[in-house]
Amino acid sequence: MPLYRQEKDWKQYGAEISRTTLANWIIYCAQHYFQPVYDYFHRELLKRSFLMGDETRVQVLNEPERRPQSQSFMWLFRSGEDGLPVIILYGYSPTRSGDNAVKFLDGFSGYLETDGYQGYNKVPGIKRCSCWAHIRRYFIDAIPKGKQFDYSQPAVQGVQYCDRLFRIEDSINKQPVSYTHLRAHETDSYL
């Protein structure tokens, strides 16, 4: 609930608590209680052998020394499906520089699945992997106008290939058997 509404609600109960005070409480809790938890999960995330990463634009109003129309970025890093509990962490940055990924992933060594953003190439010690959903979109964009049903087109074949992989993944996810075993069995023959 927004702080201005909380301020109003508290006032109705006879407690005059300013938005500034409420915001300071949130900041204090985040710094003293949530930051250590975040740091713990960050260290655990970096121990994994496969991560996924993405960054998306966000607009932050009233950010010091920046125009309200400025674009900032929220970075997301997630553990892969490795049978361990999933870890998902977000990180804010005023820029999209690949240096942000370098800083966040410092100490990580393994596979990193991302979109085509070249900034991830700055991260040392990783092996870049592409996301099949993004690859499928690139194939769709490569299909010439009016040729989406022309199965001799390489881009149409690429879309079909991705769709087949997605169907395999979907059937795997519905199976009660060991995920790792089934995935290796089904996808190795196809890939």
Listing of model-derived features with the role each one plays in the protein:
Residues 180-187:
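Conserved small/polar residues in nucleotide/adenosyl-binding loops
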Residues 126-154:
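Conserved beta-strand -> loop -> alpha-helix junction used to position metal-binding or nucleic-acid-contacting
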Residues 1-8:
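Short, charged amphipathic recognition helices of the HTH superfamily
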Residues 20:
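Key DNA-contact positions within bacterial/archaeal DNA-binding proteins
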Residues 153-169:
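A conserved active-site cap/scaffold subdomain adjacent to cofactor or substrate pockets
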Residues 60-62, 85-87, 120-123, 139-142:
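Short helix/loop capping segments that flank catalytic or ligand/cofactor-binding pockets
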Residues 104-135:
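RNase H-like DDE/DDD metal-dependent nuclease/strand-transfer catalytic core used by mobile genetic elements
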Residues 10-16, 24-25, 34-114:
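RNase H-like nuclease fold core
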